[in-house]
Amino acid sequence: MIVAEIYTQADGKITGFSIDGHSGTAPRGQDIYCAGVSTVSQAAYICIYEHLKRSFQGNFGNGKLSLILNNPPDEATEAVFQTMLIGIREIEKIAPQAVKLIVKPQTLSVGSPINQDLPKIS
């Protein structure tokens, strides 16, 4: 199962996310649910990194993707994160056996390291 955790601060604004797992509904590389969750979450990660140029700690690779902002969320990051959240929520609605979405308060403080060795996205 794909587990998508969305982290929020006290006011509900999204501070980051973590995606892990495989839906198990088809072989790797052929799974539409994995492709959908991967697409919306990678698009958010790349947008925060390349377009918004926000500072964050994250992990990208080996079937896992995570991002925690180094600074409080703003209107632009919230728009990106909410778009991702809506996409994952819709996939979960049609495939609850494959995708589990969890929205929860962030337990790490903004800027806490997840992985210091971030790969370059080209």
Predicted regions mapped to residue ranges:
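Short, conserved glycine- and acidic-residue-centered signature motifs
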Residues: 33-37
